[in-house]
């Protein structure tokens, strides 16, 4: 067996290869793309936004039951991209952590602490032989009275970080490149600008004109810190604004 081969080192999650890699964790990152979806999150001056593809894989499925966005608490929302059972498990765990915190402390769990907690759990899954890494990535958004809008990404390796703009999923690279160019030009975005930047980044990365029924857009703002999902008509309005601007 050559030292550059993964054979023998990708069978156990707790074993490093000679190159210092943990292959099972790398495979978990690849599993994020298994649903062929992409999500984009943007932090503005007074709002945080997530825009994510919505794909109904079967004509017999009720479209309203298909979603990638979830309410964790009144003020914290989350988008989970990757293997659906793993994503559902992560969401339930996050909701449980947030509910437990509020029961003990009397107020909603801060978004950063929740992201850190979920990252710690993910990291724990990378070093136990009887477990496997979870094949999904999480995007959290919230509006904090002191910190303002917040966006956090949590990955299968157990790493989390606050972001100005971020994308996860199969078209992550082109979406991230688009965000970097736009945010470099203007970093202080209004809530409307943040929403339209997230939608435009998603649309550009996909290379197609998306319809309102193909998108889910959720937002928290200074004026309304509750996690809110935009209606189809509201999404259509923003799509028209983007089209007219172009």
Swiss-Prot record:
GO cellular component: cytoplasm; nucleus; proteasome core complex, alpha-subunit complex
PROSITE patterns per record: PROTEASOME_ALPHA_1, PROTEASOME_ALPHA_2
SMART domains to which the protein is assigned, alphabetical: Proteasome_A_N (SM00948)
InterPro entries noted in UniProt: Ntn_hydrolases_N (IPR029055), Proteasome_alpha (IPR050115), Proteasome_alpha-type (IPR023332), Proteasome_asu_N (IPR000426), Proteasome_sua/b (IPR001353), Proteasome_subunit_alpha6 (IPR034642)
GO terms for biological process, alphabetical: proteasome-mediated ubiquitin-dependent protein catabolic process
Family label: Belongs to the peptidase T1A family.
Binding partners and assembly: The 26S proteasome consists of a 20S proteasome core and two 19S regulatory subunits. The 20S proteasome core is composed of 28 subunits that are arranged in four stacked rings, resulting in a barrel-shaped structure. The two end rings are each formed by seven alpha subunits, and the two central rings are each formed by seven beta subunits. The catalytic chamber with the active sites is on the inside of the barrel.
PANTHER family in alphabetical order: PROTEASOME SUBUNIT ALPHA/BETA
UniProt name for this protein: Proteasome subunit alpha type-6
Gene designation per UniProt: pas-1
């Amino acid at each position: 067996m050559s030292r550059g081969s993964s054979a023998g080192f990708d069978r156990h999650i707790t074993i490093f290869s000679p190159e210092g890699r943990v292959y099972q964790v790398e495979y978990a990152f690849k599993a994020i793309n298994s649903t062929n979806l992409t999500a984009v999150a943007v932090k503005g001056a007074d709002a945080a936004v997530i825009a994510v593809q919505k794909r109904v894989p079967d004509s017999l499925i009720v479209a309203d039951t298909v979603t990638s966005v979830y309410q964790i608490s009144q003020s914290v929302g989350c988008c989970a991209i990757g293997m659906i059972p793993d994503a559902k498990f992560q969401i339930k765990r996050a909701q449980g952590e947030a509910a437990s915190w509020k029961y003990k402390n009397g107020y909603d769990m801060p978004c950063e602490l929740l992201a850190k907690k979920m990252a710690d759990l993910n990291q724990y899954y990378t070093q136990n032989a009887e477990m496997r890494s979870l094949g999904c990535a999480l995007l959290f958004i919230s509006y904090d009275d002191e910190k303002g809008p917040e966006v956090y990404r949590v990955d299968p390796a157990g790493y989390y970080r606050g972001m100005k703009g971020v994308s996860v999923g199969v078209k992550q690279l082109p979406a991230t490149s688009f965000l970097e160019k736009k945010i470099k030009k203007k970093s202080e975005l209004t809530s409307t600008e943040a929403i339209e930047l997230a939608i435009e980044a998603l649309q550009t990365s996909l290379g197609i004109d998306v319809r309102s029924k193909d998108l889910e857009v959720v937002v928290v703002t200074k004026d309304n810190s509750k996690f809110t999902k935009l209606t189809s008509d509201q999404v259509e309005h923003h799509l028209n604004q983007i089209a007219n601007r172009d």
